[in-house]
Amino acid sequence: MVLVRVLANLLMLQLSYAQKSSELIIGGDECNINEHRFLVALYTFRSRRFHCSGTLINEEWVLSAARCDRKNIRIQLGMHSTNVINEDVQTRVPKEKFFCLSSKTYTKWNKDIMLIRLKKPVNNSTHIAPVSLPSNPPSLGSVCRVMGWGTISATKETHPDVPYCANINILDYSVCRAAYARLPATSRTLCAGILEGGKDSCLTDSGGPLICNGQFQGIVSWGGHPCGQPRKPGLYTKVFDHLDWIKSIIAGNKDATCPP
């Protein structure tokens, strides 16, 4: 009986340790291959390594984060596994790039947005299709889906060969202000995450989409380091607040200005 109790206690300790260790993993699972037809990967011609994600909003335009701007960007669409190439994968280069400000002068909490016009439109296919822009801002508490090929470990860069998806919640902006001392009283960003931690966007997820009720509501911008800490949610550029600017640029008004 004593031996049984000792073994039982050891098992309990192992389970407890495993639970604590799992909290260090950026939560989420492999995305369904059919749920991210709008998700694109950004890389540079020279490195050929993905550094950011983006979102296809129509056959000629992609939205990403200003922090993702690079020379010689390549945009890959229709990809799931980096090891198994889908037949309908398409690669494009930018024709034009638009920013609220210079890509060098965005701030962590404002105007981290880049609108890319593709040099050649893409064709909708099995694994490629645009996502809907928002008709309204997301409600507080909404369950949203964040996705990307970013690292799935909080302690070191561990990149999967498939995109991972995780469900997180829209939180009150005051939660992010409490977590990050330099945040201004208001900003055109969404605060989203899980208060207890364990699920979060992370390195190289920047520029990717936050999808709420089938609509594209946020662009991955920044968050705590390491990722996934309790009460350290992520910040996402609020797409709804930039709709007029986005639509004006697409309509041909290249002098359109972002909201203040």
Swiss-Prot record:
A GO cellular-component term linked to this record: extracellular region
UniProt KW keywords: Disulfide bond, Glycoprotein, Hemostasis impairing toxin, Secreted, Serine protease homolog, Signal, Toxin
Location in or out of the cell: Secreted
Protein's name according to its UniProt entry: Snake venom serine protease homolog
InterPro entries, alphabetized: Peptidase_S1_PA (IPR009003), Peptidase_S1_PA_chymotrypsin (IPR043504), Peptidase_S1A (IPR001314), Trypsin_dom (IPR001254)
Disulfide feature: C31-C165, C52-C68, C100-C258, C144-C212, C176-C191, C202-C227
GO biological process per UniProt: proteolysis
Family the UniProt entry places it in: Belongs to the peptidase S1 family. Snake venom subfamily.
Active site: D112 (charge relay system), S206 (charge relay system)
Tissue specificity annotation: Expressed by the venom gland.
